Amino acid sequence: MNQKILNSNISIRWVVALKVEAEIILDEYNMNFDPEFTLFQVFRNFEKTRWLILSGVGRHNSAAATTYLYMISKASRSTCWINLGIAGSGKGHYGDLCLVNKISNNDSSNTYPATMPKVTFHKMNLFTSDVPLTDYTLHELIDMEGSAFYDITNKLSGREFICLMKVISDGPNNDIEDLNKF
């Protein structure tokens, strides 16, 4: 992580499905579990500028957790919102970090964001499914939370403050069932 960003007072909210996906963020930002909040597991730094919520898997959980985090953390319109998680892919390589540049699901197709930063990692389209998919030929990235996260945060913040990043976890050469072994 960029030390300038780490040490700044930029307000950031992370929505992550699973604890294993969140570990590096919790360590980097020195976030601790806050037992005050019981609907979801919530972590924050001492200054209350960095918050992370574990949403659980699925669009409904992601939408509920994002809304809950917005309310309890008193996020402003200029708060940065980041969704980090795993995704299946037939195009990338296992472990690649990808920036999402378009999101779709069975109900909608949203272009995201207004402008893309210049970064060195892959930019890919994301399809959010309600069930795990193993046909990787139809979509660049497949997850189960991204579109709901974007739908909610797009109402809470400007598009330029929303970021979705996915790590490729499964694909034609890495079976989704292998994820359960960890």
How would you describe each model-predicted region?
Residues 1-10, 75:
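Extreme N-terminus of proteins, especially the signal/transit-peptide cleavage junction
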Residues 36-182:
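Glycine-rich phosphate- or other oxyanion-binding loops that anchor nucleotides, phosphorylated ligands
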Residues 9-33, 43-44, 50, 96-102:
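Short, conserved "active-site rim" segments that organize catalytic pockets and cofactor/ligand binding
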Residues 4, 29-35, 89:
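Short linear motifs in intrinsically disordered
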